[in-house]
Amino acid sequence: MMQKLEVSERKACSVLGLNRTTKRYKSKKSDDEAVLREAIVRLASKYGRYGYRRIAAMLKSEGWKVNHKRVERIWREEGLRVPKKQKKRGRIYLRNGSCIRLKPLYQNHVWSYDCVEDKLANGRKIKCLTVIYEFTRESLAIRVERTINSKHVLDTISKLFLTRGIPEYIRSDNGSEFTEKMLRKFIEDVGAKTAYITPGSPWENGFIERFNGTLRDELLNREVFYSLEEARALIENFRREYNSVRPHSSLGYTTPLSYFLF
């Protein structure tokens, strides 16, 4: 308009009722916006159950200088799912019985184990023995079998003792695979202690229950396993990513394997 009518910027803005500052404003969006947007969509597509805060933490680990608010804005613009906010809950620790009030305070203080069931495509059941290191939330092992008994538990933890040391306590429910006399004697003989939760109180084993929920939510409910071997391979891949890739909010959005580096 200014060139066509040969008028000054001041005159043109006065006629149109515009502020000169507004006229001169240019978007200050970063030049990396498109690349960042692509990265967010890529991570959200790969890790479909992660929220924008966890994606923001992963971007930072990739070298991006970005805060969660910017990631949230792009997340919403792309129509990605933003998890609903949940009320904060106090962490539940054991208050009675053989487990007493047991809180993981340092390395190799408390491990916990439990079992998770699933099915193959043909309907046959499989069972996963999950073992975690409570202090860092690291998944130490996930053993996948048709069924799990005390011999499987003994074999799994004895191998872990050789590579990871012996914990002071191993927390579990009162399932027969964990209470068999041979297993309890072995744990006692190596210098560890069993810590059994109150029967019918899975919330007392909160660390492993939380892990099992994540395993089911992010893998078991999303995959169809056509064989035991395929289930083992995919579940082991999940375990490795859980330890080395997936940021944990309880660890300040670091991963279990990098926790001691910070």
Predicted regions and their residues:
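Active-site beta-loop-alpha junctions of metal-dependent nucleic acid enzymes
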Residues: 124, 142-164, 176
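Short alpha-helical "recognition helix" segments of helix-turn-helix
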Residues: 10-15, 55
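Basic, flexible linker segments flanking DNA-binding modules
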Residues: 18-110, 201, 257-261
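RNase H-like polynucleotidyl transferase catalytic core
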Residues: 85-87, 170-174, 188-207, 223-228
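Charged, often Cys/His-bearing segments associated with DNA-binding zinc-finger transcription factors
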Residues: 1-9
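C-terminal domain-tail junction helix/linker
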Residues: 188, 214-262
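Acidic/histidine-rich, metal-coordinating catalytic segments
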Residues: 157, 164-180, 254-257
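An active-site-proximal beta-strand-loop segment
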Residues: 109-140, 146-148
